[in-house]
Amino acid sequence: MHNLVILGASGSIGQSTLKVLRRNPGRWQVLALTAARSVDAMVRDCLEFSPRFAVMVDEAAATALAGQLKTHGSATRVLSGQAALCEVAAHPDAHSVMAAIVGAAGLAPTMAAVRAGKRILLANKEALVMSGAFFMEAVREHGAELLPIDSEHNAIFQCLPEAIQRQPGYCDLAGAGISRILLTGSGGPFRYTDINALAQVTPAQAIAHPNWSMGAKISVDSATMINKGLEYIEARWLFNAAPEQIQVVIHPQSVIHSMVQYKDGSVMAQLGNPDMCTPIAHALAYPARVESGVEPLDFFSVGEFSFIRPDYERYPCLALAMSACQQGQAATTALNAANEEAVAAFLAERIGFMDIARVNEATMVALGSSPVGSLDDLIALDGAARARAHNLIEELS
């Protein structure tokens, strides 16, 4: 049986992964589930899936989980801390690792899985945004297999020739007859909102995505469209694409998840209802296909497809991310760190919606040209960018 580790089991992607497993009993064995501090969810899922290991980042949460599992007679071994995350991600019995921890916190365990040569189901886009070339070099050096979970990158992956699928990060798009990648995005909940009203947007409004059901952080990222900017950077590394080979297209219906345009004029697109269970099922079973539980697309009810050019005045964070991709690794690392801090401050109602872009830009300008020669340099830069962003947030609060 295929052993699976789910990093970030209590989050949106982790829960969708478990949903796909329920649709396909007996195909995968859950080796480990991890979470930060969601004890109740972990008790429920450990009792259902009987993993060998359960890891809580928070030590008090681990103690609480261990006590409750013991009461239920569970044999699951409970571990705690960042080192334990890395340990289960690289466990000799693990075949695939779902990397679904949100943000920079997911980099270390994801990299541990890469260095152990695992099949990585990559939902943590920040790992690539933060570490780019270092991450892809580790994938190649250690023989890891990389399968994208983001709906857009999974769609692009499915539209590429099999030879390209087998060597992400080191493929030759032009040599395979590909002219460009068309990266689609819904435009978020404010694509038609008066620009002058965006400063008054509340967290509750920002997390109400019109098409997708997602966590709070990624919902805000979608509203600012920095999510699409981070995906632009991720696509650059995943598919060895030059920035000019990637075009962002706003597609409000969220039915076409992305496209690949070939030099002969053909365009390959991957379509489906907006549900993360589809790309998760694809990556879990690749190259086979399994039930995802997602309703088949009904073309007659969709009605129409529309496409809009991005408005960078409305979406300054998207422009910042694309600029960071041109600048290089330090800029993307600084931007990602600043954005995590800024979004957390916005959700806590400490800064306004448009302040997110201000914090991101000021941090990127200050630190985006820092020298980075190693992963340790990137981690240090991440910390410096967070400190800088924190100071800016204090000034704006």
Swiss-Prot record:
Example GO biological process term? isopentenyl diphosphate biosynthetic process, methylerythritol 4-phosphate pathway involved in terpenoid biosynthetic process
Task: Cite the binding residues for NADPH.
Answer: 10-13, 36-37, 124, 126, 215
What is the superkingdom listed in this entry's lineage?
Bacteria
Where along this sequence does the record place binding of Mn(2+)? 150, 152, 231
Q: Does the keyword 4Fe-4S apply?
A: no
Q: Which Pfam families match?
A: DXP_redisom_C, DXP_reductoisom, DXPR_C
**What are the protein's UniProt keywords?**
Isoprene biosynthesis, Manganese, Metal-binding, NADP, Oxidoreductase
Record InterPro entries: DXP_reductoisomerase, DXP_reductoisomerase_C, DXP_reductoisomerase_N, DXPR_C, DXPR_C_sf, NAD(P)-bd_dom_sf
Residue sites binding 1-deoxy-D-xylulose 5-phosphate per the record: 125, 151-152, 186, 209, 222, 227-228, 231
Name the pathway: Isoprenoid biosynthesis; isopentenyl diphosphate biosynthesis via DXP pathway; isopentenyl diphosphate from 1-deoxy-D-xylulose 5-phosphate: step 1/6
Which HAMAP family does this chain map to?
A: DXP_reductoisom
* PANTHER family reported in the protein's UniProt record: 1-DEOXY-D-XYLULOSE 5-PHOSPHATE REDUCTOISOMERASE, 1-DEOXY-D-XYLULOSE 5-PHOSPHATE REDUCTOISOMERASE, CHLOROPLASTIC
Family as reported in the entry's similarity comment: Belongs to the DXR family.
Q: What is this protein called?
A: 1-deoxy-D-xylulose 5-phosphate reductoisomerase
